[in-house]
């Protein structure tokens, strides 16, 4: 997560303001499960409510039908194409919020962790993998999967209710370090050390633990 935590938060290409917020999306445009269709359904309602908002859509692929559909919004919807790792980090750090409207096929929300590390407000579909990372909405806002109307509502609420959004950002910043590879590696090694030293003793993990350590303990106990 370190490259995202250290990314510039003032890149003028991506930076939003209170009056003109930016909402970022990152994903393969022509891969349906990445959810661009869901975001496209939400955009008209958001722009009606927040006319100066800008949507920054990054990712490879054409999705020409959606591009044509959104062309009427002019500069309010910007297709960036594929972006470098450096630009990805700058976009996540500089944008007002990041939206992950994926509809399925996500085993772990690594992009949510990256956005959390960058310090942006996170909005995601309520897939189990995303809900787990965001602690059921404590670290980011969730919307009903595949529901563009609900996504629009959550984006508008996130932009308008700054104190609540900032509280989620602060909570996310306090826990995102647990996903750093150095931390995860240390935890994995600790689990293996524990397994070797307690080979004949059953280890009881903390009930309901969602940490990497807790999950590995569960696996070793089975």
Features from the language model and the residues they span:
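Conserved donor-binding/catalytic core segment of Leloir-type glycosyltransferases
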Residues: 6-8, 13-34, 40-43, 56
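Glycosyltransferase donor-sugar binding loop
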Residues: 26, 54-67, 81
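Short alpha-helical donor nucleotide-sugar binding micro-motif in glycosyltransferases
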Residues: 82-83, 90-95, 110
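Short hydrophobic beta-strand element within catalytic cores of glycosyltransferases
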Residues: 97, 121-124
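Short Ser/Thr-rich beta->loop micro-motif in glycosyltransferases that lines
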Residues: 100-104
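Conserved acidic donor-binding segment of nucleotide-sugar-dependent glycosyltransferases
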Residues: 136-137, 141-148, 157-163
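A charged, aromatic-enriched C-terminal amphipathic alpha-helix characteristic of glycosyltransferases
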Residues: 163-193, 200-201, 205-214
